[in-house]
A protein has these predicted regions:
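Hydrophobic alpha-helical transmembrane bundles of multi-pass membrane proteins
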Residues: 1-170
Length: 170
């Protein structure tokens, strides 16, 4: 925490921070929270290496739990993003609305990408798309309007879907 998260917080939000000086905007911590977690996960995966053949069997997820979990995460994300406005005001309402629309647009985009590729449409895919939209909108939710949030969610889900397809194909 101290060696990874705190320096990134300083670089992003402190007026003397490196990223702050370059004009980086991060409303609700998407850069700080999601990038540090993503790089930590990448470091862990590189350290652990690929799975052995015996670990490659894929167990199916419990679909109702995935849907419930996604709904709870989506609901909690409203507090994460809208709460970053530090008040009940227009900025919080905008963050709430953009969070919801980005997640919904990403969910639809993910499902459409699967359908265009000829894959079976699944509720798990829709849930993954929603989470992609939530992550993508987090740094921008207080700075963009609803229309822009739809574009952010849809593009993020399309790019993520293609990346997952490419990863699974190779």
């Amino acid at each position: 925490f101290i060696f990874i998260y705190a320096p990134v917080c300083h670089m992003t939000w402190h007026p003397d921070g490196l990223l702050f000086k370059y004009g980086i905007l991060d409303f609700a911590g998407g850069t700080v929270v999601h990038m540090t977690a993503g790089f930590a996960a990448l470091a862990g995966a590189l350290f652990l290496g690929p799975r052995t053949e015996s670990e490659r069997t894929h167990e199916f997820a419990n679909v109702p739990y995935v849907i419930i979990g996604t709904g709870l995460l989506w609901f909690g994300w409203f507090g994460f993003n809208a709460g970053s406005a530090l008040g009940v005001n227009a900025k919080a309402a905008n963050a709430f609305a953009t969070t919801n629309t980005a997640a919904a647009a990403a969910m639809i985009s993910w499902v459409l990408m699967d359908a265009m590729r000829g894959n079976k449409i699944s509720s798990n895919g829709a849930c993954v798309g929603a989470v992609v939209g939530l992550v993508a909108i987090t740094p921008a939710c207080g700075f963009v309007n609803v229309g822009e949030s739809i574009a952010i969610g849809a593009v993020a889900a399309a790019v993520s879907n293609m990346a997952v397809h490419f990863k699974n194909k190779s």
